[in-house]
Swiss-Prot record:
This is Holliday junction resolvase RecU. The gene is recU. Transmembrane segments: none annotated. CDD domains: RecU-like (cd22354). Residues 1-25 are annotated as: Disordered. Pfam families: RecU (PF03838). It catalyses: Endonucleolytic cleavage at a junction such as a reciprocal single-stranded crossover between two homologous DNA duplexes (Holliday junction). Endonuclease that resolves Holliday junction intermediates in genetic recombination. Cleaves mobile four-strand junctions by introducing symmetrical nicks in paired strands. Promotes annealing of linear ssDNA with homologous dsDNA. Required for DNA repair, homologous recombination and chromosome segregation.
Amino acid sequence: MTIRYPNGKRYNQASQPQKTPIKTHTYSNRGMSLEEELNETNQYYLTHNIACVHKKPTPLQIVKVDYPARSAAVVKEAYFKQPSTTDYNGVYKGKYIDFEAKETKNKTSFPLQNFHLHQIEHMKQVVAHNGIAFVIIKFTLFDEFYLLDAKHIIAFWNRQNTGGRKSITKEEIEEHGSLLSCGYHPRIDYIRVLDMVYFS
């Protein structure tokens, strides 16, 4: 039997999109990207009226678009309109917060080449205006997360520029940063550390 849509188009069973399975969450969610984990955490904070933090959109200039079907558009070429600053920003307890999320597979250090000068300058500006700026670093091999204040990132960046190390050792991150606790909800509880570091 042939089934047709109201517009006369033939129904094709194979062309129907497959239902994506519902994600099941384990306690550790190993394999999840840091961005996914933070987005999930921020959604929890927003839903429970704890904080309002969002991922910043990346501004793109679309140059070329193909229309393989009348109702579909495929972007073929796009460029960044401007250099991005940091990944996330928002408000917590009346204070502006702004942070970058980075992950590394290195066991002993975090390479500073993962940062760009405009990101460092942006963090300096946030701090100069009494905002809270920091970086969340994930060591993927250990499934460990650290919150490191912008003043330390800036100091390590300056050290690199004066002939010093081009990375931050894990020991330095452990010394100057705060280990973030992980759980089910919120996944990465960075607000608890903000309370201890900035609001105590």
